[in-house]
UniProtKB/Swiss-Prot annotation:
UniProt cross-references to NCBIfam families, sorted A to Z: gltX_bact
Motif stretch ('HIGH' region): 9-19
Compartments where found: Cytoplasm
Binding site for ATP: 240
GO biological process: glutamyl-tRNA aminoacylation
Motif ('KMSKS' region): 237-241
The keyword ATP-binding appears for this protein: yes
Native organism: Salmonella typhimurium (strain LT2 / SGSC1412 / ATCC 700720)
Protein name as catalogued: Glutamate--tRNA ligase
Record has Hydrolase as a keyword: no
Binding site for Zn(2+): 98, 100, 125, 127
Entries under InterPro entries matching the protein: aa-tRNA-synth_I_cd-bd, aa-tRNA-synth_I_codon-bd_sub2, aa-tRNA-synth_I_CS, aa_tRNA-synth_I_cd-bd_sf, Glu-tRNA-ligase_bac/mito, Glu/Gln-tRNA-synth, Glu/Gln-tRNA-synth_Ib_cat-dom, GluQ/Sye
GO molecular function annotation: ATP binding; glutamate-tRNA ligase activity; tRNA binding; zinc ion binding
Length: 471
């Protein structure tokens, strides 16, 4: 049997991390078994579905590189198919037309709740032989079995049983002729030959209803696996108050897709004590049996740690392709300065996100108009004039511009003036970067370049002279 899974989001908003984890688990299960992965857009909610949400879902899937083998399919383009199946069910007696008014149903609900009963349709039209005009408004309901139970072996949670007496006669077509969500899902899974449905635990109550419809259609019933929810670190359901929840927001915040995928796969699944997983390792090791039944807590610090790891272990050239977008967001002109792959090497240890890297690299490419006030006050003082003049002259004398020779020039300045490296290094750092923090000074000065470094030292000397004149 060929394994076939699907990810079926509703385009009523962005792709959130819970949906992304479900997509990842479905994708990994299919890839592990050499099967196929289908993308299906469940857009039957015409009022809330938007083109922008569809685009956001596709962007998120593409950014995570969760490629699909079939689709994207759109439910709104399959209404003829759904209605044809409903007509067949009406003919077969597994569905029936319901003419009950909204007022009657509301009164029925109120009466049942007053008696402490679970609100459900009472089956009036199921057993009615009244004649109705062809154009009289009605819905179509599924004739759910009235006895027995539905048992399915959840691939994560084990056997789950529902009594058919607890299940309603589900509406499968509205009065406007549009099919409903639970019915469309069933026909799609049947037509697309889905073998394993991996989805959130909020769908558990839908499963017995969908199984009953599949059986009424004499269609194969897939295996089901329901993944637990994701909570915030406070134990409450993950929401915007816990930080970003949209996949593309993590892109915007400077995370690499490898980091988010690695974090999401471990958010409810484990393989021993291993924390770092390549995509290939995920595919090889993933199994539904190792997925936890308990809710997972989202820990942003752990994700940040993983992101820092991947910034420093993936090929700098690859990281640079993702960094480019953030550089563009900061409007930095990188034509005069180090290659972005070199920048990744320079700033990787200091920066935990690509956004942070882009926001802290401008001095490598563009001149700054003023020095950081605190850094200048502390380090660009009259006592720094001589170290800056000496190191400037030694840097000017370098014929083979390299980080090693820059280091020798700084060290030689400290030796000549008989001062510690900090007495030379800190004023030099503020002079060439405009701030008090940077990567190692020799590689920083080397990356900024000889001409630009000397110009900035002269600017710092001018700043010191002006400061002296004001005292």
């Amino acid at each position: 049997m060929k394994i076939k899974t699907r990810f079926a989001p509703s385009p009523t908003g962005y792709l959130h991390v819970g949906g992304a984890r479900t997509a990842l688990y479905s994708w990994l299960f299919a890839r592990h078994h050499g099967g196929e992965f289908v993308l299906r857009i469940e857009d039957t909610d015409l009022e809330r579905s938007t083109p922008e949400a569809i685009e956001a879902i596709m962007d998120g899937m593409n950014w995570l590189n969760l490629e699909w083998d079939e689709g994207p399919y759109f439910q709104t383009k399959r209404f003829d198919r759904y209605n044809a199946v409903i007509d067949e069910m009406l003919e077969a007696g597994t569905a029936y037309k319901c003419y009950c008014s909204k007022e009657r149903l509301e009164q029925l609900r109120e009466d049942q709740m007053a008696k402490g009963e679970k609100p459900r349709y009472d089956g009036r039209c199921r057993h009615s032989h009244e004649h109705h005009a062809d154009d009289e408004p009605c819905v179509v309901r599924f004739a759910n079995p009235q006895d027995g139970s539905v048992i399915f072996d959840d691939q994560i949670r084990g056997p789950i049983e529902f009594s058919n007496q607890e299940l309603d006669d589900l509406i499968i077509r509205r009065t406007d002729g549009s099919p409903t969500y639970n019915f469309c899902v069933v026909v799609d899974d049947w037509d697309m030959e889905i073998t394993h449905v991996i989805r959130g635990e909020d769908h558990i109550n839908n499963t017995p209803r969908q199984i009953n419809i599949l059986k009424a259609l004499n269609a194969p019933v897939p295996m089901y696996a329901h993944v637990s929810m994701i909570n915030g670190d406070d134990g409450k359901k993950l929401s915007k108050r816990h930080g970003a929840v949209s996949v593309m927001q993590y892109r915007d915040d400077g995370y690499l897709p490898e980091a988010l995928l690695n974090y999401l796969v471990r958010l409810g699944w484990s393989s021993g004590d291993q924390e770092i997983f390549t995509r290939e390792e995920m595919i090889k090791l993933f199994s539904l049996g190792a997925v936890s039944k308990s809710a997972s807590a989202f820990n942003t610090d752990k994700l940040l740690w993983l992101n820092h790891h991947y910034i420093n272990t993936l090929a700098p050239e690859y990281v640079a392709t993702h960094l480019q977008w953030h550089i563009e967001q900061e409007n930095i002109d990188t034509r005069n300065g180090p290659q972005l792959a070199e920048l990744v090497k320079l700033l990787g240890e200091r920066c935990k996100t690509l956004k942070e890297m882009a926001q802290s690299c401008r001095y490598f490419y563009e001149d700054f108009s003023e020095f950081d006030a605190d850094a200048a006050k502390k380090h660009l003082r009259p006592v720094a004039r001589q170290p800056l003049e000496v190191v400037r002259d030694k840097l000017s004398a370098i014929t083979d511009w390299s980080a090693e020779n820059v280091h020798h020039a700084i060290q030689a300045t400290a030796d000549e003036l008989e001062v510690g490296m900090g007495k030379v290094g800190m004023p030099l750092r503020v002079a060439v970067t405009g701030a008090g923090q940077s990567p190692a000074l020799d590689v920083t000065v080397h990356a900024i370049g000889k001409t630009r470094s000397i110009e900035r030292i002269n600017k710092a000397l001018g700043f010191i002279a002006e400061r002296e004149s004001q005292q």
